């Protein structure tokens, strides 16, 4: 009985804290502007690096969402060293400009092959792409950083890396190199150190082989996945591209479930948060109903699911309302399961600050230090 009472208190506090955070998030103009670009080496010497980002993308949302006050953050990705990106571009490409819609970003990242046989590493071209293609904030107080992740000789290619760094610095962009360790490359490590020194950043190192595994600690991940799938089925797609977006919702769940069950929980929290809820009126009938209760009558029935397209208007309205309340119920059940796990982990002493040298841990640690310097409280786990 006492354990149940403690759980209810813990759940109340969690919901109270979460609601406070979403209030701040809704007032984005008052938050600290943070632009983060991951500039990734996708050559053979960095095979597997892309997995470090895409498998932990939701870790970044989870980190930022628990900061107080919540920053006005955006994430973008530039990649280099793939021949498919074109010699004229220095084998570099902007994968996704700065933004907050992480689901399409995740979808794009999982389409990139993680391994190739070779590739030319033109770091200067990669940074030039960050300079010319990324829509950096004009806010003079913004934190604007590039996590330059890779290895090899930084002087290769036609771009003058020093001149490019000067132009980035003039825009207030700081480079934080993260070197992927390769035996016998002491000379190139010094080059990466020089980038950090000249840009005002700090050099870190990681091993791409490093991985950490989720501690389920008795958590019923299969039951959680079943709830999550039911939650996804409350989304009623419509319109041009509606089915594609609904499929993306499910695909990204499957991707992260296979690779990182901790990230799977973070993504579930994202989907029940104010960052996602009522934000999909362009393709979901339930969110459209929130926006305009009669707008569903004007949608093209041919774009609906087989179940919905056969319904009369009054039946479809009733079905939308049913799915609306089912979504609320499932959101609460998902939150309950996560809160119960967090309480159990805390009681069992399973909550620790992550220290392993992986891309997500190193970069989040850097972000924490930068935000704390701006008097923003950030989580340590």
Regions found by a protein language model. Give the residues of each.
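Acidic/histidine-rich, surface-exposed loop or edge segments in extracytoplasmic proteins
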Residues: 30-45, 105-111, 171, 299-302, ...
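Von Willebrand factor
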Residues: 30-144, 146-147, 155, 184-189
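Solvent-exposed loop/turn segments at secondary-structure junctions
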Residues: 42-46, 80-86, 114-117, 151-156, ...
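C-terminal "exit" segments of structured domains
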Residues: 199, 203-295, 331-360
């Amino acid at each position: 009985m006492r354990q149940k009472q403690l759980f209810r208190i813990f759940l109340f506090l969690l919901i109270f804290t979460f609601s406070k955070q979403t209030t701040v998030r809704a007032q984005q103009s008052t938050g600290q502007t943070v632009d983060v670009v991951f500039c990734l080496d996708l050559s053979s010497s960095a095979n597997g690096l892309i997995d470090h980002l895409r498998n932990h993308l939701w870790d970044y949302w989870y980190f930022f969402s628990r900061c107080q006050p919540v920053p006005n953050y955006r994430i973008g990705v530039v990649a280099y060293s793939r021949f498919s990106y074109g010699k004229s571009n220095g084998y570099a490409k902007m994968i996704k400009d700065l933004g907050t819609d992480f689901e399409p970003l995740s979808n794009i990242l999982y389409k990139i092959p993680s391994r190739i046989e070779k590739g030319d590493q033109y770091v200067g071209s990669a940074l030039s792409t960050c300079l010319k293609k990324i829509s950096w904030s004009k806010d003079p107080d913004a934190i604007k950083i590039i996590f330059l992740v890779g290895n090899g000789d930084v002087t290769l290619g036609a771009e003058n890396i020093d001149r490019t760094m000067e132009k980035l610095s003039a825009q207030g962009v700081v480079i934080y190199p993260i070197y992927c360790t390769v035996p016998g490359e002491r000379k190139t490590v010094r080059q990466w150190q020089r980038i950090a020194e000249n840009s005002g950043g700090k050099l870190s190192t990681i091993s791409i082989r490093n991985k950490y595994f989720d501690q389920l600690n008795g958590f019923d991940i299969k039951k959680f996945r079943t709830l999550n799938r039911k939650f996804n089925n409350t989304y009623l797609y419509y319109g041009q591209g509606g089915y594609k977006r609904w499929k993306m919702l499910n695909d990204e769940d499957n991707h992260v479930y296979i690779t990182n069950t901790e990230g799977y929980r973070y993504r579930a929290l994202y989907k029940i948060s104010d960052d996602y809820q009522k934000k999909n009126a362009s393709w979901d009938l339930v969110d459209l109903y929130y926006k305009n209760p009669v707008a569903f009558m004007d949608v093209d029935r041919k774009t609906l699911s087989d179940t919905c397209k056969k319904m009369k208007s009054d039946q479809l309205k009733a079905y939308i309302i049913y799915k609306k309340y089912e979504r609320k119920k499932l959101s609460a059940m998902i939150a309950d399961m996560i809160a119960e796990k967090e309480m159990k982990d805390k009681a069992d002493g399973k909550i620790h600050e992550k220290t392993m040298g992986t891309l997500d841990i190193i970069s989040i640690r850097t972000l924490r230090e930068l935000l704390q310097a701006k008097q923003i409280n950030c989580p340590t786990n």
